[in-house]
């Protein structure tokens, strides 16, 4: 079985996501053939960002990684599994699904990440290695993680950038900015 045999990319919408994103007014595509990556400023307004931050602050827990690598400092951030029943979370999820065209049943629960001064998530991928220890746990039923959608909720005084090693592109935090990239190559 091939890596994505259990996910019908033609019916999931994931194969058309780049085309849909490219048609969104104001969206910018990274000028590289190495990665399908898009950025949209102002995706969320200040009130929505503040409401999500309040939920994250209330329900935060230490972040984890799917496939432990023995490096305790690999990911030092905190995480919140946002309540999928919350009206604000529902509205944001609906906007994300409308934007990408990927049906909701192929999406993962929304999480919020918090990075305090000095915290980080070292270089990693958002897709799962089919030969890794985490493949059966995370991909046997739902399939490979095809697209990642990330929204910055605030602008720290310093730090907070997301760097893509494959392209050399670094994105600075800007409240409400959406980053979307394809993990399947």
Predicted region positions:
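Fe(II)/2-oxoglutarate oxygenase catalytic core
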Residues: 1-180, 184-185
């Amino acid at each position: 079985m091939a890596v994505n045999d259990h996910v019908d990319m033609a019916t999931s919408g994931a194969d058309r996501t780049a085309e849909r994103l490219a048609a969104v007014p104001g969206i910018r595509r990274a000028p590289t053939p190495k990665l399908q990556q898009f950025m949209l400023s102002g995706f969320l307004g200040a009130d929505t960002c503040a409401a999500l931050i309040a939920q994250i602050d209330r329900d935060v827990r230490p972040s984890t990684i799917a496939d432990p690598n023995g490096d305790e400092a690999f990911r030092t951030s905190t995480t919140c599994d946002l309540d999928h029943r919350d009206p604000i979370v529902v509205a944001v999820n609906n906007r994300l699904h409308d934007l990408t065209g990927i049906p909701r049943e192929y999406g993962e629960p929304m999480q919020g990440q918090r990075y305090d001064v000095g915290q980080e998530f070292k270089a990693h991928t958002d897709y799962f290695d089919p030969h890794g220890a985490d493949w059966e746990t995370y991909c046997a039923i739902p399939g490979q993680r095809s697209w990642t959608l990330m929204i910055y909720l605030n602008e720290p005084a310093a730090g907070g950038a997301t760097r893509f090693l494959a392209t050399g592109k670094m994105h600075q935090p800007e409240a409400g900015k959406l980053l979307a990239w394809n993990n399947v190559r």
